[in-house]
Each structure stands twice: as structure tokens, then as C-alpha cells.
Curated annotation (Swiss-Prot):
One of the record's GO cellular component terms: plasma membrane
HAMAP family from the UniProt entry: FluC
Top-level taxonomic group: Bacteria
Protein name stated in the entry: Fluoride-specific ion channel FluC 1
InterPro entries cross-referenced by the UniProt entry: DUF302, FluC, TT1751-like_sf
Family of this protein: Belongs to the fluoride channel Fluc/FEX (TC 1.A.43) family.
Residues that coordinate or bind Na(+): 58, 61
Biological role stated in the UniProt entry: Fluoride-specific ion channel. Important for reducing fluoride concentration in the cell, thus reducing its toxicity.
Reactions it catalyzes: fluoride(in) = fluoride(out)
Naturally occurring in which organism (per UniProt): Brucella suis biovar 1 (strain 1330)
Keywords: Cell inner membrane, Cell membrane, Ion channel, Ion transport, Membrane, Metal-binding, Sodium, Transmembrane, Transmembrane helix, Transport
Length: 254
């Protein structure tokens, strides 16, 4: 039954190399890569290994049925077997390349169409990410300058990129700055001590694979929910929301 079904779906290999099916496979893999990249952009995932893994897995599933059919039908003759072997090899390589090309196309499409821009977006993890017009280093400098001008303390800066370099590893520019107002922070910790785990405020400037720079901070309102803060913290949280928003907007803008 399986062989009869494959015979219906696959052209006889004795007719020559199944180019039409190969083209269909490549197109399917390209579209898969495009959709995968757009979805990754939508959910704000920058894990390249995960994206590629999803794409490759889908690509393999797309052409596996064709490859299996080719192998089954190859039993007809040696020439058919050679055609099947060539098809499987070309299909695997072309499928991988098509998936990668589709992922690149999806990323470019998202940039051009602004379909899923992460600009000023709050995602489920409580992170607010805005695109910065400046380099990572300059963005962090602007965070520090604005925070100080608003009476906040700048506690420390951590250059993750430099740390990676010292460890002999590669990492795009990534820098963390910690700042805040002890008066507001103390009120929050008097309410729930565990919020000290997320204080002072942290801002991370980072460069993505396309060279764009982003500034990510914790959403103070989300932190209030995470630590189940009470009414006594409302004023301090509102002040933190305003202060963090002002600093972020200035640091990432003109």
C-alpha cells in the first residue's frame, strides 16, 4: 500500500531527475525559513541556534518523504538508484540553503515592513525593549547622564563584551548599567524584601546580529506583580515607572 501511494506521489525515476519536485522542495524550505524568522521576530527571540534548529528540522521533514520515495523506487534499476541518490544529496543541501535564505529574507522583511518591530514592547517576561539610535557605549553613557540629572545614583557598569573578550569568546557589544533611587527602593524592600533581587534598576544595551542597538529594562509594574507588592509601594512604583521611562526614552532617542 505504501509503495502504491508513493508511486502516485512520485514520478518514475526512470524518467530522469525529478527536478520539479526538487524545486517544490526548495520553495517550501525557503518559505519555512521565512516564516520561522518572522515568528522568532514576533516573540522577540534572538537565539540563532534555536531558529536554525527549527528551520532545519522543518526542512528535513519537508524533503524526507520525497527522499524516502526515491529510495523505495530506486530498487527498479541501478540507474534509478543513482538518480535517487543524487536527488537525496541535492535535496538535502538545497533544502538547508533554502531554509537559511528564507530566514535571512524573513529578517529583512520584518525590518522593511516593520511587521514585528520590538520597539517599546513589553513581553511576558516583564522586559521593555526599545531601539536605540546610538552605539551600545553611547547608550549606556546617556543612561548614566540622565539618571544622574534626575537625582538617581549610578552604582556600577558591567561590560559583558569586554568580559567575553578576556575569556577568549565572542560576543557583540553588550553592556549593563545599574542605577536607581535608594529612597524608592527602600520603600519597596520594606514592603517585600525579595524585590531586592531586582533592585537597583538594571538597563542592558546590546547589539543584535544585524548591527542594531537595543536597550532593555525591567518593567517596574511587572516587578510589583512578581513580588506581590502591597498598596504601600504604589507611590514608589509609579515613580520608578516614570523615572525608568524617562531615562530609557532619553538614552535611546535623539
Amino acid at each position: 500500500m505504501t509503495r502504491e501511494f508513493i508511486m502516485l506521489m512520485m514520478p518514475p525515476l526512470t524518467d530522469g531527475f525529478p527536478l520539479d519536485i526538487l524545486v517544490a522542495n526548495v520553495v517550501a524550505c525557503f518559505l519555512l525559513g521565512t516564516v520561522t524568522a518572522l515568528y522568532a521576530r514576533k516573540i522577540h527571540s534572538r537565539d540563532v541556534h534555536t531558529i536554525i534548529g527549527m528551520g532545519m528540522m522543518g526542512g528535513v521533514s519537508t524533503f524526507s518523504s520525497f527522499a524516502y520515495g526515491s529510495v523505495v523506487l530506486a530498487s527498479a534499476s541501478m540507474s534509478a538508484f543513482l538518480i535517487a541518490a543524487a536527488y537525496v544529496t541535492v535535496s538535502v543541501v538545497a533544502g538547508y540553503v533554502a531554509v537559511l535564505a528564507g530566514m535571512k529574507f524573513g529578517e529583512k522583511s520584518a525590518d522593511i515592513l516593520h511587521r514585528y518591530p520590538p520597539m517599546a514592547s513589553i513581553i511576558d517576561s516583564g522586559l521593555v525593549t526599545v531601539e536605540s539610535r546610538h552605539s551600545v557605549a553611547e547608550t549606556i553613557e546617556r543612561v548614566a547622564a540622565k539618571a544622574k540629572s534626575m537625582g538617581m545614583n549610578v552604582f556600577t557598569r558591567v561590560d559583558h563584551g569586554a568580559g567575553a573578550k578576556e575569556a577568549g569568546l565572542g560576543l557583540p557589544p553588550t553592556e549593563l548599567i545599574i542605577f536607581g533611587n535608594p529612597q524608592n527602593g527602600t520603600v519597596l524592600m520594606q514592603d517585600k524584601r525579595t524585590i531586592g533581587l531586582d533592585l537597583p534598576i538594571r538597563a542592558l544595551a546590546w547589539e543584535d546580529g544585524s548591527g542594531k542597538v537595543w536597550l532593555t529594562v525591567n518593567d517596574p509594574a511587572w516587578l510589583a506583580q512578581r513580588h506581590s507588592l502591597g498598596l504601600s509601594s504604589d507611590v514608589a512604583i509609579k515613580a520608578m515607572v516614570t523615572g525608568t521611562g524617562t531615562v530609557t526614552k532619553y538614552a535611546a532617542g535623539d
